Amino acid sequence: MKLIVGLGNPGKQYVQTRHNIGFIAIDKLLSYLNTELKVDSKLQAAYTKTKIEGEDVIIAKPLTYMNLSGDAVTKLMNFYKIDVEDILVILDDTALPLGKIRIRQTGSHGGQNGLKDIINKLGTKDFKRLRIGIGEHAHMDKVDYVLGKFSTNELNTILPTIEYVNDAIIEWISTNNFNNIMTKYNTPQTL
């Protein structure tokens, strides 16, 4: 069984913000799969259990704020007895150019507080992550930038990237070969 978690902040005020790119990716995946999330306050997540290419998959969004994302990830992992190496976290990255992705099997939190909390709560950094570039914040406070909404032009760049992310997720689940996914999808994509 796999666990795919998109990071973001709950609440209408955060819809379409840069920090919520993980939620945006999950919404697109759910639309593709024609399924919806259900809220489970005990697990601190909105999630669904579905099948992709015959594999059981949990797709989730934490109900907590970004900085406490580890609570939901840990609870889902323990409840469904999911191995840490079968977890994929989708998140924003200000160090990547807008619309570029980076897929890794392990690594640091890179200053991303949601990822930092997951690493702390799981007690390991050895889980998969898919970072989506939201660009730099050179002329803005970082917090204001990540909590700011995408412009129309930025959305036009991001939406094809989300399709690319879905392709990577589906291929990972169908092949169970993450090394090939990293090789194929980490190369610069033309959108």
Swiss-Prot record:
- Give the binding site residues for tRNA: Y14, Y65, N67, N113
- What GO CC terms are in its UniProt record? cytoplasm
Q: What keywords are assigned to this protein?
A: Cytoplasm, Hydrolase, RNA-binding, tRNA-binding
Q: Name the predominant localization.
A: cytoplasm
Descriptive protein name: Peptidyl-tRNA hydrolase
UniProt-annotated catalytic positions? H19 (proton acceptor)
Q: Name one GO molecular function term.
A: peptidyl-tRNA hydrolase activity
Enzyme class label = hydrolase
- What are the subcellular locations of this protein? Cytoplasm
Q: What Gene3D superfamilies does the record tag this protein with?
A: Peptidyl-tRNA hydrolase (3.40.50.1470)
